[in-house]
Amino acid sequence: MFIYCLPEESESFHKEILSIEEEIFQGLGLPYRIVDTATGDLGAPAYRKFDIEAWMPGRGDEGEYGEVTSTSNCTDYQARSLNIRYRDDDGKIKFVHMLNGTAVALSRAMVAVIENYQNEDGSITIPPALVSYTGFDKIEKKN
């Protein structure tokens, strides 16, 4: 997901992207947490970044959370290098703010779905939100 917006709108849009990403993982019924990334861990373009980490029971010795999506507010950092500008109401030329969000890091999200929905017999229950797309509700070993 990408957003180009006015500087005064970027915080609000950042929260909106995070809300969309959170809704996706709530819909999948996965345990997750939101991490507000520490400033020292941000890449150069990002002013602020949120990660959503889903619980992955198979990670480590006792399971761990792993990043499945993120959203970054890059303010005008990317706009400056790309020279993306707008003219404000007073006629002044300013740089837009740019934001991005992964939505779903598919390979990592699939790990979380498989590990959280695996049954004792090895079958995997399909999350209810995906059944209408898959056409089935369980993955089972063929006899």
Task: Identify what each model region corresponds to.
Residues F2-N143:
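TRNA-recognition modules of translation machinery and tRNA-sensing kinases, especially anticodon-binding
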